[in-house]
Swiss-Prot record:
Gene3D superfamilies: 3.30.300.30, N-terminal domain of ligase-like. NCBIfam families: PRK08008.1 (NF005947). Belongs to the ATP-dependent AMP-binding enzyme family. Pathway: Amine and polyamine metabolism; carnitine metabolism. Keywords: Ligase. This is Crotonobetaine/carnitine--CoA ligase.
Length: 517
């Protein structure tokens, strides 16, 4: 079944410009408060100019172009400008340092980079010291250094015509993007995403939020992340809605931005909810137009209830990962919700819980969450140049092994337990890190928490807790362990405590556990 009508991204943007014209498509707010607005017509013209820019620099269909940018209009221009000429975007996490960025450049085979001044010295070093295929750099925001192979993105773009000059044949099966996974436990893998994937993601995520063309979807999620691209941007554009992209999350500014732009949809991760809750309460907290807050794992019931009551919102839970493109399990529009369930399988997907022998399990039994989709259409196509890794998670008939553990109930609601790699084996018992973190997070002095397993010669693994305290608080080991003993089984109580100023996180707010082991 062809869900998207054979429409690739170039056709999508030409149609959107025709249908919605002068309606606002994109609003970008920088950390300094600078706001840029573009109508659907203007945005399509900027995309065309950017496509022409890349063509003048020698980029052709199938070439890879890396983007190392924070949230900004140029990211959107490049994303779709590359797609229009059949080239492939390789977004790089803007928080990555030299070694990690060089590794992605090498493994993606990117020949051109678009970045900003703050990252340029790092790439100068990479060009001098690392073997890459990079032959040109475009800078988005500064006067040019006196250096060969470097251009001003804005100057070159503004010299281009607003109509597309190069339009090679495109197929919805063509690769549009290679997005490298966050690599919280190992080296990142390049997830191959097609034009079909992105078009489907737009329709699917718009359905999940019941988006209309009068909606305003605001996000602070990084543009180089699958959530921003497929849950937010593609959904908003596919529905003809307005997409508001804020450069960076600020707990002090976020709720005001929701109110200022009259957002009807936004998305939050647990870190955002916890930091919003420690902001001073305001009489205007519930003065907003939000219909849904898209939510991603993981939060205790106490935290969820307090957030929803204070801000007068409801959470729409969505579960997915880069490889699934969208939230393939989640709450459905107009359907009942059952906290702490992560929802039910969405349309075009099947979901099962399987045991260690890949056999389906009945309701109530814990196993691996597995999803069935169509590679290159409703789930990712493959890992770039890594067939062994692809075969490890993706079966020939489209079943994807997520590596997450969970269970389902008799009505088809699924419940997340933990990442398999986050299960601690302690003296014959399996302990979920997420379960412990949700309990410990309810302590009134604790702002942030992660637990990890560390080697133990007697019990296989011991449990160590890393906590960040609320400002001005102190917490003794005696008080911490007493709280744990009162709220969890004895075998789950951590053996060690470390109090830190912060925890290592990636761009999507996930703890980088390998940095703590």
């Amino acid at each position: 079944m062809d869900i998207i009508g054979g429409q690739h991204l170039r056709q999508m943007w030409d149609d959107l410009a025709d249908v919605y014209g002068h309606k606002t498509a994109l609003i970008c707010e920088s950390s300094g408060g600078v706001v840029n607005r573009y109508s659907y017509l203007e945005l399509n013209q900027e995309i065309n100019r950017t496509a022409n820019l890349f063509y003048t620099l020698g980029i052709r269909k199938g070439d890879k172009v890396a983007l190392h940018l924070d949230n900004c209009p140029e990211f959107i221009f490049c994303w779709f400008g590359l797609a229009k000429i059949g080239a492939i975007m390789v977004p790089i996490n803007a928080r990555l340092l030299r070694e990690e960025s060089a590794w992605i450049l090498q493994n993606s085979q990117a020949c051109l980079l678009v970045t900003s001044a703050q990252f340029y010295p790092m790439y100068q070093q990479i060009q001098q010291e690392d073997a890459t295929q990079l032959r040109h750099i475009c800078l988005t925001d500064v006067a040019l250094p006196a250096d060969d192979g470097v251009s001003s993105f804005t100057q070159l773009k503004n010299q281009q015509p607003a109509t597309l000059c190069y339009a090679p044949p495109l197929s919805t099966d063509d690769t549009a993007e290679i997005l490298f996974t966050s690599g919280t436990t190992s080296r990142p893998k390049g997830v191959v995403i097609t034009h079909y994937n992105l078009r489907f993601a737009g329709y699917y995520s718009a359905w999940q939020c019941a988006l209309r063309d009068d909606d305003v979807y605001l996000t602070v999620m990084p543009a180089f992340h699958i959530d921003c691209q497929c849950t937010a941007a593609m959904a908003a554009f596919s529905a003809g809605a307005t997409f508001v992209l804020v450069e960076k999350y600020s707990a002090r500014a976020f709720w005001g931005q929701v109110q200022k732009y009259r957002a009807t949809i936004t998305e939050c991760i647990p870190m955002m909810i916890r930091t919003l809750m420690v902001q001073p309460p305001s009489a205007n907290d519930q003065q907003h137009r939000l219909r849904e807050v898209m939510f991603y794992l993981n939060l205790s019931a106490q935290e969820k209830d307090a957030f929803c009551e204070r801000f007068g919102v409801r959470l729409l839970t969505s579960y997915g990962m880069t490889e699934t493109i969208v939230g393939i399990i989640g709450d459905r529009p107009g359907d009942k919700r059952r906290w702490p369930s992560i929802g039910r399988a969405g349309f075009c997907y099947e979901a099962e819980i399987r045991d260690d022998h890949n056999r389906p399990l009945p309701a109530g039994e814990i196993g691996e969450i597995c999803i069935k989709g169509v590679p290159g259409k409703t789930i990712f196509k493959e890992y770039f140049l890594n067939p062994k890794a692809t075969a490890k998670v993706l079966e020939a008939d489209g079943w994807l092994h997520t590596g997450d553990t969970g269970y389902r109930d008799e009505e088809g609601f699924f419940y997340f337990v933990d990442r398999r790699c986050n299960m601690i084996k302690r003296g014959g018992e399996n302990v979920s890190c997420v379960e412990l973190e949700n309990i410990i997070a309810t302590h009134p002095k604790i702002q942030d928490i992660v637990v990890v397993g560390i080697k133990d010669s007697i019990r296989d693994e011991a449990i160590k807790a890393f906590v960040v305290l609320n400002e001005g608080e102190t917490l003794s080991e005696e008080e911490f362990f007493r709280f744990c003993e009162q709220n969890m089984a004895k075998f789950k109580v951590p053996s060690y405590l470390e109090i830190r100023k912060d925890l290592p996180r990636n761009c999507s707010g996930k703890i980088i556990r390998k940095n703590l082991k």
